[in-house]
């Protein structure tokens, strides 16, 4: 009898070992990835979300097949962010993907154990998110950019477009650590180019942009740098309309502002960041600890120029700038 039992167990073990790997995995819990967007709405198309999913597919992780992506939207209502993050934490999600500083901060406050992957963060060390780039520590890692060089490059580009530029304004949201770090970087860049800088400040969730522009000094401004974040993104159309009426050349890091009427943008290629964020998720699902995965910098950058806006402002964009541009809106 004992021999028969032993033989039966051996046969079951043999048959199980011969099953395809995919069939064996069905007994395991399917990994669940929480993806949180500060803007957008359920069902709305998102090229960046598609880039993230493609990044996962490149490693054979397919949504609704061997992973589940739980996508949540704040729909521009940033005050909802803590509640959205806490909902995913309560669901015991396996990884949280935080697309920007607003989501990163909410996720970091909500959990010390669930891995968090940053898609884009202004200097995470200065913001207090990680201990260092090489050894983040804790439960957070991902992609970030050191804005000092990028801020200087943006101011330099404005100087190329406006050789006589002497005064610039920085429009920024004072309610978050990311824009605060960025503003300090632009202060340093302005000093480097011997420019006078005017701070135009707003604060979420109900920013008063007309008042912010009225707070500018009586001397005319030459250009406006918009520090991109979810609050600015939500009100981009209003901001750009005011800037254009005041005949201000606008610069920002995000190409979407140029597509909505801004003059020029220079910054990391967003789709590439989302694809690379997927690589972090894959590493974590395979057992890596986020605190041991170094924070990486962008490797691809893009320059967008809006010729229609330039014409409205009476500006002529130099040919060498147009040749370098990844996209020119005519």
Label each PLM-derived region with a short phrase.
Residues 1-330:
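Short hydrophobic alpha-helices and adjacent helix-cap/hinge residues
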């Amino acid at each position: 009898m004992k021999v028969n039992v032993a033989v039966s167990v051996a046969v079951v073990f043999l048959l199980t070992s011969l099953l395809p790997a995919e069939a064996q995995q069905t007994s395991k819990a399917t990994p669940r990835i929480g993806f949180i967007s500060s803007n957008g709405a359920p069902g709305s198309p998102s090229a960046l979300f598609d880039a993230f999913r493609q990044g996962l597919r490149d490693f054979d992780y397919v949504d609704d097949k061997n992973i589940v992506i739980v996508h949540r939207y704040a729909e521009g209502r940033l005050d909802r962010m803590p509640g959205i993050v806490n909902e995913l934490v309560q669901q015991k999600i396996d990884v949280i993907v935080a697309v920007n500083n607003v989501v990163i901060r909410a996720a970091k406050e909500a959990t010390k154990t669930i891995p968090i992957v940053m898609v884009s963060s202004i200097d995470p060390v200065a913001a207090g998110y990680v201990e260092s780039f090489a050894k983040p520590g804790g439960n957070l890692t991902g992609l970030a950019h050191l804005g000092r060089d990028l801020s200087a490059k943006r101011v330099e580009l404005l100087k190329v477009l406006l050789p006589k530029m002497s005064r610039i304004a920085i429009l920024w949201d004072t309610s978050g650590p990311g824009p605060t770090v960025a503003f300090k970087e632009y202060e340093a860049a302005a000093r480097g180019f011997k420019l006078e800088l005017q701070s135009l400040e707003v604060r979420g969730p109900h920013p008063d942009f007309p008042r912010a522009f009225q707070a500018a000094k009586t001397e005319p401004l030459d250009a406006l740098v918009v520090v991109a974040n979810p609050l600015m993104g939500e009100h981009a159309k209003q901001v750009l309309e005011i800037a254009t009426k005041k005949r201000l050349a606008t610069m920002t890091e995000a190409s979407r502002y140029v597509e909505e009427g801004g003059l020029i943008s220079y910054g990391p290629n967003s789709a590439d960041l989302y694809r690379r964020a997927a690589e972090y998720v894959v590493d974590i699902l395979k057992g890596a600890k986020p605190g041991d995965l170094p924070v990486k910098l962008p490797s691809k950058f893009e320059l967008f120029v809006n010729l229609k806006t330039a014409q409205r402002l009476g500006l002529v964009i130099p040919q060498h700038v147009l040749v370098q541009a990844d996209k020119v809106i005519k």
